[in-house]
UniProtKB/Swiss-Prot annotation:
The keyword Cell membrane applies. Belongs to the UPF0154 family. The keyword Membrane applies. Keywords: Cell membrane, Membrane, Transmembrane, Transmembrane helix. One of its GO terms (cellular component) is plasma membrane. This is UPF0154 protein RBAM_017710. It is found in: Cell membrane. It is a single-pass membrane protein. The chain crosses the membrane at residues 4-24.
Amino acid sequence: MTLWVGILVGVVALLIGVALGFFIARKYMMSYLKKNPPINEQMLRMMMMQMGMKPSQKKINQMMKAMNNQAK
């Protein structure tokens, strides 16, 4: 009888640990993305304008494609 209780306690503790880990990781990722948002086309356009470049759609598409390929 005590073996079953030990196994049950172990399984319950494992499930609680998995659930707790999931929510902690989710909260961390949400705060990380809030502090460091991913770059989109509008941000690239603004960066290029600040550097004195005239942002063409072709150049923006090339930069986005290069960034997406680098992230993989």
